[in-house]
Design a protein with these regions (language model features):
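Phosphate/nucleotide-donor binding subsite
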Residues: 45-91
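Aromatic-rich, lipid-facing transmembrane alpha helices and their immediate juxtamembrane interface loops
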Residues: 1, 73-75, 254-255
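Glycine-rich phosphate/pyrophosphate-binding loop and the adjoining helix
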Residues: 180, 184-256
Length: 256
């Protein structure tokens, strides 16, 4: 939609990976719609994921005992946060939609050694293990950028969070197949896996959450299947601004 601004937070090491293709097609499709696209390529930026004393410029409010949350909150109010944090906060503040493009791996298995799955010798992707969570560099981005004062306050969270007029969407790839992420699958229902991130982090800051875009097991998929994953994402983006946010406190999560 013309005039909309989109931030893509990209957390993958290899530009030629399927995550790179998903990012590229998102940029192309949204640009065709007249959107302004900004990309934070965290690995290319060498983004610092650690939350440390260096995030506060100048004197601490309590030099005798360092409390990161308190000091960053005070630094935000005094405009004395490190520039890499404020640069990212500006990108978030200007965005109507934030897309998190990430690769998730759910265990330590080397899928290429399983004979029942086809392997691809050329252009094969290798990844760190993320253990049902986001890559450390993206976790660090959230820890440092979505700080108190900028993204939320007490009170001022969930539906009252400071980013309540923005949309967020997780676009991610997995190591396991779709069947593994079902209620009867070995890894469990994927909705439970994403709930802490979608609700506990993003919705806590006020984001309205769009349904995730999940590309299952591209590493063991055929070339045609991988192309279909990218095409499916491109097709969805054509009507992304018409989508309604998902319910972040659904009854199924609480066994109702």
């Amino acid at each position: 939609m013309a005039g909309k601004k989109v931030l893509i937070v990209y957390a993958h090491q290899e530009p030629r990976s399927i995550n790179g293709s998903l990012k590229k097609v998102a940029m192309e499709e949204l640009s065709r719609q007249g959107c302004t696209i900004t990309v934070s390529d965290l690995y290319a930026m060498d983004f610092e994921p650690r939350a440390t004393r260096k995030d506060v410029i100048g004197a601490l409010s309590n030099p005798e005992f360092f409390n990161y949350g308190v000091e960053v909150y005070e630094a935000f109010k005094k405009r004395s946060l490190a520039s890499d944090i404020t640069d990212e906060q500006k990108k978030v503040q200007e965005a109507d939609l934030v897309i998190f493009q990430i690769r998730n791996r759910q265990d330590g298995s080397d899928w290429s050694r399983l004979s029942q799955f086809p392997t691809r010798r050329e252009g094969r992707e290798t990844f760190p293990l993320y253990w049902f969570g986001m890559p450390a560099i993206l976790k660090g981005w959230m820890d440092r950028v979505l700080c108190q004062g900028f993204a939320f306050d007490i009170p001022g969270f969930y539906d009252s969070g400071f980013l309540k007029n923005k949309l967020a969407l997780l676009s991610l790839t997995t190591g396991g197949t779709a069947e593994m992420y079902t209620k009867t699958g070995v890894s469990g229902d994927f909705r439970y896996f994403l709930w802490p991130l979608q609700h506990g982090a993003l919705h806590f800051c006020g984001f309205k959450i769009l349904a995730p875009q999940i590309s299952f097991a591209p590493e063991i998929a055929s070339e045609e299947e991988r192309k279909a994953m990218v095409a499916s994402w491109a097709q969805r983006l054509k009507t992304i601004w018409e989508e309604e946010p998902i319910d972040c406190t659904p009854p199924w999560y609480f066994g109702q």
